[in-house]
């Protein structure tokens, strides 16, 4: 798929920027924890995590049309992360990353934050449905399982 490629060490800072920005924009409003989202969570630490854990980087693919605008991280048949830089959202980049992961990496399910209605709607538009399964991450973050439909 055009513009999608495996992530490399050179992408680590952009991957970290995209993830941190999305956490702040999408999750801070729900959890309202400024000390975490604007203190503990930072690009330097996130980039270091990806540099030190090669499995994280190996499982990432980026959308790069000259600028890295989005990332998807896949483990087995699970989509673990999918984020697009907010300035480039609503341009089909997330859908292209997800389509790539479904077609090339055989992604069939994911866990979505229960409060993230925008994200859940995006996944539904792209062929996923809620399964009814719910889990708590870190004992306080409610996640809902979504599975790819047979279409």
Indicate residue ranges for each PLM-predicted region:
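A short beta-loop-alpha structural element at the N-terminal edge
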Residues: 3-17
